[in-house]
Structure formats: C-alpha cells, structure tokens
C-alpha cells in the first residue's frame, strides 16, 4: 500500500527551521552556551569525564582555504568544529595543521570564546545556505529562507517495506512552494536515537521546556509483562490516555507525588527483576507533543510556542541517520 498523508503543519516566523531528534531537545542550549548544559543530561556521571565535556572547545576555521579545509578534514558537518572535549582540543588542532599542510591548504582553527550557542549554530548554518552541524555529537540540520507568514503542511509518503516488516514512511517533506522541482541539494543527516524527528522554528526551540512542567504536574505511566502485578500492588488504574491501551498509571499528579510514585515503581521493578517500563512525564511542551503523537493515527503531533508551531513525528523506521534534501524550484526556493 502506498499513500501520502498530512502529519500536520509547522509555522516558522524566524524563517530558520531546525530538524532534530525530538528526544534530544533537552540538550538544546538555545541562546545559552552549551557549557551551561549539565553533563548528567548526556548520561555522564564520571566527574573527570564531566569536567572534560564541560570544558569543551568550539573551533572556527579561518584562512583563504577554510571551507575546503574543514570539508576535507571530514571530522564534522558544517563550517566549524563543535564540542571538542578539552583533553582532545590540542590533538585536533595538531591533526588539522597536518591535514592542511599535506593538502597545501591555508587554514587554521581558532577557539570560539565561550562556545557557540546552539541557536547561533542554526542561524549561522542557515545563513551559509543550510546544512548540518552537531549538538553534543548528534547531527542536526538547519535551513533558512522558510516562509514566515503561513503554516506549512508536513507530508509523509508510506510504502510497504516487505518481508513482513509492515508499512513505513519512505519520506517526510515540508512543502514551501508549488513550483516544479528544478534541482536537489543535500543538506546533511539528522541523527536519531529516540525514533522521532522534530521540525521547529529556531526561536521557538530557545523557549522549549523539555522536562520542566509548565503547570507543576506530571503523569506516571507503566506497561509490560509485570504491569498487572504492579497495578494491583500500587493500586494504579488504567492511564486512560488515547493510543495507550493497556498502559497503567496516574495523570495530573503534583510533581513531588509523581516523582515519589515513579521512583517506587522503578525500585520495585529493579529490585525484583520484573519486566516493565516506567515513564515519568512532566507536563512540559515535550509531554504535550508526545501525548498527541501517541494518540495520532499517523504518529505525529504539534504544539504552539508563541507564534510558531513545531511538529514532531515518529520516523516509522526507528533510529538511525536520515538524510535531508532541499528540492529547489527554478527560482531557488526550497522545500526541505
């Protein structure tokens, strides 16, 4: 079975659209330095490793051959090198010098004072024509020139994958114009670890709250082989959320109570070795958008942040690297 489905719409008042794994938005620094992000959010608990990451360096590439040098160096997408751990910075500089010397290129690395905020990376990348950059090692894509004054439909094409794998999205696209495609330009890859992609205005992402509840409330959900046993022990009802049949838990709890119940469930699960997933869900924009995703027949949801609308969609293919292409009409207008 083949078909095209509308997943929803996005609105991008800034004209700069970011494509990122929605599960990683807790790492997005917005207008702040990435050094302000707690290494614990990266899964780093060792204090020495945390200090190394917190002291990381961003490098700008300067010199007449800068563009060629950074591209052929091949360490990262984009025109800069980001998030180089402090212990590796000197080694990267030395390797770059060797590379330029061997290739006869005139370029050098210069440390960016205070690091480059993620929102600044996106805007600069868009100004340079669009493309990819890294956010703590995760590939992200930014594109500029997106219409600012209207909602843009997000479409997905579905095809049968074969061999019993069922139907999956073959592509997801945002239509910014109606002209015929004259050329295509690869922009880079999105790195996905949470099976979802988010399309968002760069300014809207700067006010995104990933885990902080906007109303002081949270949900606790659990499911799996031991869910019935846990529900009886903890007196948990059906969660009652659309698209989550068989999931147990509580909705709209005060944050301290929700944390207490989630931790109690996790301790019971881990202490007994039972098979069950426990999900703590603060009422944040991330919770709102994922609530829509879980209830959606097409695995997509959206949330308004100011004048912007951001959309999150499940990939239908799990995790991986997903290429992004700008299809241009004869005037050079794009449709990422």
Write out the residue ranges for each language-model feature.
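C-terminal structured interaction module
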Residues: 295-336
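Compact soluble domain cores
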Residues: 273-303
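Extended, low-hydrophobicity segments enriched in charged/polar residues
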Residues: 2-284
């Amino acid at each position: 079975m083949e078909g095209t489905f509308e997943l929803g719409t996005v609105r991008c008042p800034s004209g700069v659209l970011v494509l990122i794994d929605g599960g990683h938005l807790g790492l997005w620094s917005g207008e702040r330095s990435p050094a302000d992000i707690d290494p614990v959010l990266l899964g780093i608990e060792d204090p020495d490793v945390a200090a190394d990451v917190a002291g990381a360096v961003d490098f700008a590439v300067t010199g007449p051959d800068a563009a060629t040098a950074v591209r052929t160096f091949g360490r990262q997408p984009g025109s800069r090198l980001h998030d180089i751990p402090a212990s590796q910075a000197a080694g990267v500089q030395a390797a770059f010098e060797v590379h330029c010397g061997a290739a006869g290129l005139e370029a050098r690395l210069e440390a960016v004072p205070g690091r480059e905020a993620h929102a600044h990376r996106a805007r600069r990348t868009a100004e340079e024509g669009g493309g990819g950059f890294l956010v703590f090692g995760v590939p992200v894509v930014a594109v500029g020139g997106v219409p600012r004054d209207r909602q843009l439909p997000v479409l997905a094409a579905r095809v049968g994958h074969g061999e019993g794998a069922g139907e999956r999205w073959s592509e997801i696209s945002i239509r910014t114009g109606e002209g015929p495609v004259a050329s295509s330009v690869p922009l880079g890859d999105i790195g996905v670890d949470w099976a979802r992609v988010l399309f968002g205005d760069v300014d809207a992402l700067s006010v995104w709250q990933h885990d902080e509840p906007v109303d002081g409330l949270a949900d606790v959900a659990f499911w799996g082989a031991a869910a019935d046993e846990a529900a009886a022990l903890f007196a948990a009802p059906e969660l009652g959320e659309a698209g989550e049949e068989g999931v147990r838990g509580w909705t709209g709890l005060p944050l301290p109570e929700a944390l207490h119940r989630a931790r109690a469930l996790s301790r019971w699960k881990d202490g007994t070795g039972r098979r069950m997933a426990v999900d703590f869900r603060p009422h944040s924009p991330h919770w709102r958008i994922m609530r829509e995703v879980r209830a959606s027949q097409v695995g997509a949801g959206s949330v308004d942040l100011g004048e912007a609308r951001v959309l999150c969609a499940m990939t239908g293919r799990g995790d991986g690297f997903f290429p992004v292409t700008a299809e241009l009409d004869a005037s050079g207008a794009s449709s990422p």
